[in-house]
């Protein structure tokens, strides 16, 4: 609706900006080799795809050379390791086509873990924790902030709770950037942000 996802697609050059420039590391993205650029960006969508195969095989789609230890670490950060170990076959559990035999929240966490195995410079979470509860959402964000601080994290979300501890928040409205700031700054200066925050808190924070 407000072009949040389109803005992100400019980074990996699924689209090119018609005016101005998008810079990564201070360099216009159009100056990078396209394959090299996309190798450094991992995007987790709200409805990412799992294929028929084991959990281990699905995870290695992000990095075919990933070790078992690296997979387990990525799953711990994505809050997936615990539920995987509850399956009788653990990481060898068979996933049906499209992830039909796991919940929406489990699927999202597996996709986040898979993206982490790519070891990207930029990690984009495009509404990709929408199916997990607010506590798990918070645990994922805390783990990413603590254990991969050198990775730039871009979080697209409807829930302000998912972004309010970000270094910088971009408010999108009607396909344009409406405001940029921290949570505290936007609460003071931006009517749209303040109204959304108030309405979500009244509704319990899950809107």
Residue ranges and their predicted role:
Residues 1-207:
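ABC-type nucleotide-binding domain
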């Amino acid at each position: 609706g407000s072009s949040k996802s389109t803005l992100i697609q400019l980074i990996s050059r699924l689209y090119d900006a018609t005016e101005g420039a998008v810079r990564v590391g201070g360099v216009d993205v159009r100056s990078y080799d396209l394959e090299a650029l996309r190798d450094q960006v991992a995007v987790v969508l709200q409805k990412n795809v799992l294929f028929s195969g084991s959990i281990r095989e699905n995870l290695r789609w992000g990095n075919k050379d990933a070790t078992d230890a690296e997979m387990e670490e990525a799953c711990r950060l994505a809050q997936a390791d615990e539920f995987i170990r509850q399956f009788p076959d653990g990481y060898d559990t068979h996933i049906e086509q499209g992830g039909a035999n796991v919940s929406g929240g489990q699927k999202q966490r597996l996709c986040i873990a898979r993206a982490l195995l790519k070891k990207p410079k930029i990690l984009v979470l495009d509404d990709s924790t929408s199916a997990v509860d607010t506590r798990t959402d918070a645990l994922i964000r805390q783990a990413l902030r603590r254990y991969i601080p050198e990775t730039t994290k871009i979080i697209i979300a409807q829930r302000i709770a998912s972004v309010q501890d970000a270094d910088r928040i971009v408010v999108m409205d009607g396909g344009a950037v409406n405001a940029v700031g921290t949570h505290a700054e936007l609460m003071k200066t931006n009517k749209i942000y303040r109204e959304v925050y108030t309405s979500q808190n009244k509704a319990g924070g899950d809107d």
